[in-house]
Amino acid sequence: MLFNIFKKSNKKKLDEFLNENKDKVLTLKLDKPVDCLCDFTYNFIWQSKFNPETEIKENITFKTLVEHLKNGGVVYIKGNVGKRFCSSMGVDLKYFSGSGERIKVGTVIVDGDVDTRFGISMLSGTVYINEKNKIKEPMGNVIEVESDIKGYRKFISITEFVEERYKEEKLLKPNKFDKNKGILEINDKIKRDTVGARLNEDKTIVVNGDVDLSTGILMRKGKVIVNGNAGKNTGAVLNGGTVIINGNTNDFTGFEMRDGIIVVDGNAGKYLGAKKKEGVIYARDGKEVPPTKKYELNNDDIAFLKSLGYTGKFYKFI
């Protein structure tokens, strides 16, 4: 049977998509890359002097883009975008008197290259990037799914995928998702920051490969397992759940940790547990700083680690 050869694609052309959403499209034309576009934190405004009302071009400000997305709009960017694109997109940030939870937001389309840290801590929304363009690593808490716009790659939040969008989106190989067990397996070897950011359900994210900054940041439930090494701030501001690194981590593991468990089957770096409040860190090695202290394991600790498949010398940092 040859019918599949002539099967019509369900993908729309970009013009069709834009025309269907013409009342919601905001177009931004860039002459050069600009950092922090569609960044819901405005370059971590609580620790920077960033002004959201800064004009990017033609009366469009950084705040214009964020508010347009919050209202379910479409942002169409023509040109290369800079670093931290779509940072914390879809988060109702507490700093701005929000709930800290996910909010539904709109869509971003890019005809251009994308610089590093695209989608760090991203929690909702959809980003389409022209397949002719490049995306620099590390990326953020995003994963590619099957696109419905011809000629464009489609990215969504890893956290949102495992919590709900797995029902409607199709992962691209070699990544896999087991719907029955709630386990996402990331095999694409793309280096990412903030994997599993703000995870709030009992789902599991497994990364087969190295990760970079802030794995599991602000998690409350679930599990992130990295079969590789991790960068700085692993488990930062962890508020529950479990982060397991089957390798080494860089410095500041468990920074400002509030709850939950971190297991490092290797060296957890320097400044371990800096500004930590609650929670437990297990590691084979690492240099803690006050208020965190280093302890030998008790029988319950040994039994817990054994239940995860670990034996040999570990320390507990609390």
From Swiss-Prot:
MF terms in GO: oxidoreductase activity
InterPro entries, alphabetized: Glu_synth_asu_C (IPR002489), Glu_synth_asu_C_sf (IPR036485)
Pfam families, sorted: GXGXG
Highest taxon listed in the record's lineage: Archaea
CDD domains for this protein: GXGXG (cd00504)
Recorded family membership: To M.thermoautotrophicum MTH238.
PANTHER family associated with the record: TUNGSTEN FORMYLMETHANOFURAN DEHYDROGENASE, SUBUNIT C (FWDC), TUNGSTEN-CONTAINING FORMYLMETHANOFURAN DEHYDROGENASE 2 SUBUNIT C
Name of the molecule in the record: Uncharacterized protein MJ0658
Lineage: Archaea, Methanobacteriati, Methanobacteriota, Methanomada group, Methanococci
